[in-house]
Every structure is written in C-alpha cells, then in structure tokens.
Amino acid sequence: MITPYDSGGLLLSYKCNSRCRHCLYGCSPRWRKWLSITDAHKIIDGLRRVSDVSGRGIHLAGGEPFLDFPRLLAIQRIAVEHCVRVAYVETNAGWCVDEDDTREKFELLKDAGLDAVLISSSPYHAEFIPVKRVVMAIKVALEVFGPEGVLIWVSKFLRQLVSIDTQEVILFDRYVKTVGMSEARHSINTAYQLIGGGRAGANLGEFFHKSPPEAFFDNNCQMELFRSGHAHFDPWGHLIPSMCAGISLGDARDLPKLVKELDITKMPVVQTLAEEGMVGLYRLARRDFDYEPEPDGYMDKCHLCVSIRKHIAQRTRKFKELAPVEYYEQI
C-alpha cells in the first residue's frame, strides 16, 4: 500500500528554542523527548532496506537539532555507517551566538560526511531569533560547506528582515507594519510554501483566502498518506506520512514489518481519510464528537484536517494514529 520512499526526514526532537506561529510540528521549548541513538540506527537501517533514498537522501531536523549537538553528530555518523545520504541538516541558527563555536560544529558535521545545511529565515523565526545570528550562521556555513552546501529558507524573507533590524528580535506585527499588509500577504502566500497543518492555519489564516469545509470534500488523502514517497520519523519512532504531522502510521523502528503489515482498518482516522477524504472525517467529527466548523473557514484541507483531529484528540485517546498525543497540546 505504501509507495517506497525516496526521501525522508528524521525529527531528532520536537524541542526547539522557538515557538513559531507557523510550525507544522508544534515545536517549542516545552518538549523533552529526543530520538535515541538505538532508534536512529533502527529507523535509518529500515529506510535503507525498504526504500531508495540514495538520490534525494534524508534530512535531519527538529525542533532544533543543534540543541543536542553530540546526538546530531552521532546520528549523522550513523547515516554514513548505513550508507544513507544526509542531504542536509536544518537549523534556525538560534544557537549561533559565537562564530568559533558555530564553525567548529559545522566542521565536525562536514568531517562526518554532511554536505549541506539548511538555515531558516522567516518572520516567524525572527520573533525569537535575532537576524544577526542567521547572518553569521550563513557566513560561517558558506566558509565550511561552500555555496552549494548552504540552503537559505527563505532568501526573500531574509532580505526583508535584514532591512528591518538585525540586532533584536522582530515581532510579527512589526514585520507586517514595516513591509505593508499587501506585501506581507503576498510573501506569506508565496515564499514559504505553507500548508495549513500545525499552527499555520490557526495563526496565519488571515493572510490566506479561506473556504468552508465543503470546499475540501472532493478528494481523499491517499496521496499524502501512502504515495508521496516522503515521510518523517519522530523521537517515538512514529512514521509520519508526508507532511501530516500528528498522524502516525505505526512504529518505524521496524519499518520493513510496518510497510508489509500496515492495516488501516485498525486506524479509523487514517482509514476514513484514505477512503473518504475530508468529507468522511468531517462527518465523523460532527456525528461522534460534536465538532463545529470554524466560522471564518479554512485556508486548505490540511487546516481543516488538523482542526478536526485536534478537536477529537482533546476528547478521546482511542485513536492510536493521533500521535504523539502531546502534539495536539502544542499546536
């Protein structure tokens, strides 16, 4: 049922030095759990056995993976040991306060086989991280990895933020006021490729056209759940299909077994999304859990989906696929 993966991401933790208003994974400083070294071995080996990630590779992310640098470095080495390419490590550069320390960490990762880093820059991150740290991280990364080894996500936002303030954090309202509502709406709609899952729909919906639930009733979610070729793996070992944070298809610490024996009849939410799509999940939530649609509507089907799933998760824990349960407390 699951199309073999050609790429994937390991979430070393949901723990982050920020609590960004757009975050798909509900990351914040409140999370505690980290992916164990043992489980990293199992997941990466499983990916190698059931997928072909030799081309696009995997990425290491969070949360903020540099908050536990020894673990990050160890997992980079594990990937090399299993002949699985790490395409890049993601970072928000919040930890980059000392240039020598930043260079040392980047050099250790490069020596361990890492080819690239992805450095985030956006008005969501800038509420927590001064732009000067991002600028310094980019400078050092270019020296260590070269221009082909530095991905800036997103350059347009970085240019805007540098023109506002590099020394202090930039509150979101200040960003919008400075660039103007029209430009802010255009940039937020086009620059970051946001989807409405996680916190984005609830916190940034005013910048998007919204529609009633019925607008998202046409299609099922089989592509996202089973056929995207991409997945994420969190510190509990949950297999997160595509970008569907808060949904687990099972325990990825034995990925060959999971892929072979996947039984969605034991996961009613997943089965409903796969067979009926949003219309089925919406009717289930209305019928069994008194879900009321949000009066202003939804920016996309992922916004509707996570709104319903959060409502259900707050009322029952009988759906094991709504995991980790802490996710629904953090978004």
List where the protein language model places each region.
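N-terminal pre-core extensions flanking Radical SAM catalytic domains
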Residues: 1-31, 243, 303-308, 312-315, ...
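Activation segment
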Residues: 20, 69, 128, 241-243
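Conserved AdoMet/S-adenosylmethionine-binding subsite of the radical SAM
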Residues: 67-228
